[in-house]
Amino acid sequence: MSEAEKTDVLLVGAGIMSATLCALLRLLEPNWSMTLVERLDGAAAESSDPWNNAGTGHSALCELNYTPARPDGSIDIAKAVNVNEQFQVSRQFWTYAVENGVLPDVRSFLNPIPHVSFVTGADNVQYLRKRYEALVGNPLFGTMEFIDDAGEFARRLPLMAEGRDLREPVGLNWTQDGTDVDFGALSRQLLGFGAQQGMDTLFGHDVTNLSQNSDSTWTVKVVNRRTGRKRTFNAKFVFVGAGGGALPLLQKAGIKEAKGFGGFPVGGQWLRTGNPELTAKHQAKVYGLPPLGAPPMSVPHLDTRVINDKSWLLFGPFAGWSPKFLKQGKVTDLPFSVKPDNLVSMLGVGLTEMGLLKYLIGQLLLSEAARVENLREFAPSAKDSDWELDIAGQRVQVIRKAKGKGGVLEFGTTVLSAADGSIAGLLGASPGASTAVPAMFDVMKRCFADRYPSWEPKLKEMVPSLGVTLSDEPKLFEEVWARGTKVLKLDKPAGAIPATTDGQSTAGTEHTPTAATV
């Protein structure tokens, strides 16, 4: 057997998480050797691919599941603020990366698109008013508007107004400062920077085994999927950023921190159109309320997307189901992930998450016509012939042990790391990619505890708010926000966005609040 090739850092998976960690470590430790292993033939071809996710820069501006109403009717904004704080960290790092040549083409991955919450019915409009009142006093949400005027609704969202009975109350929380993110293009630029700085990249290679050595390093065996050639690496640190493939690899590694964890795969589907007559009439990411009793992943939204310099509309998500943990995975992924240490967790979720089961069954029974009928709640004039069904990526929801319940399903992103800091991985889904930078800061703090203090001055240069809650520091927020807006070109209209039917565009422009705006 050939001698193991030594590397300081080995990254598994070429998606947004590995790409972000790659760029951060390259900037902090340019002399470290680094190797990337990806099973597919290109970067960001699974969950980070723009067609496999919603592309929302998740900052809780429009996602109503982050702002639940309390029993007394008041609005709990804690989760929304936390998600937004994390997105601000990512936004600041992208700003630094653009300024320093790490990200050479900002418009290829980031476009300004308003983020909008949408409801109908008097009670829901009242909820949206309360949500606005609870959030707008926080600096991170200071530009939010509340709109309940039918005429203003029709002006800003003409496609959604077309064919709608506007005698029924409608309400919007409108934030002009939202973003559409192509995480695939972003990942490729970050990995391109890593490769330029000497990182070895192995595409079309599978990791077949991971085992820890007595000196805490890892022996990682890989195989070329085309030629069958086998290689062995000796890595001081391993990061498993393999999306749905992370859990099986962490199980192979045998770290005790992964014991008890399970995964439940849920597929995504979208209706999409590139019809310019329709894209001109809708220039926002508009999120509604989830169906009663449905899981957070079911929140419906009608989104403007900018992908490869073309404007699209996506509506969904609709759930699909497959036992695969990756879109290009294997049908054995789910059954092979069941182990003695997570069997109770998996069975517990099966017995307690009846709402999810009911939701999935209902989704799987939907016909094409029924999906378009759901779309008509947002765009009443939608025609079946204008829309096509697109199969998106797989998301593996985390199952964690819980006392008295066996296991619970977690909707979010979870970092797992070994106690000795020699290996880490990321599990879960939304807000996921939008929080890649703070998630990787967490990985670095856990796994490089001895070095992290010496990195902090450089990290603070990248992210000026590091260690600070921006909600409590409005002046600092104003400074980093203004700098980011200029550097990231978020003060310019979005690329590939056509003018609306009245010759104006709501995307990527500032506007003066009207009489319809509270």
Swiss-Prot record:
EC numbers, comma separated: 1.1.5.4
Record's keyword terms, sorted: FAD, Flavoprotein, Oxidoreductase, Tricarboxylic acid cycle
Transmembrane segments: none
Keyword Endoplasmic reticulum among record annotations: no
Keyword Flavoprotein: yes
Pathway, per record: Carbohydrate metabolism; tricarboxylic acid cycle; oxaloacetate from (S)-malate (quinone route): step 1/1
Reaction(s) the record says it catalyses: (S)-malate + a quinone = a quinol + oxaloacetate
GO MF annotations in UniProt: 2-hydroxyglutarate dehydrogenase activity; L-malate dehydrogenase (quinone) activity
GO BP annotations listed: tricarboxylic acid cycle
Domain of life of the source: Bacteria
Biased amino acid composition, Polar residues: 501-518
One Pfam entry name: Mqo
Region spans: Disordered: 495-518
Required co-factors: FAD
Protein family according to the UniProt entry: Belongs to the MQO family.
Protein name: Probable malate:quinone oxidoreductase
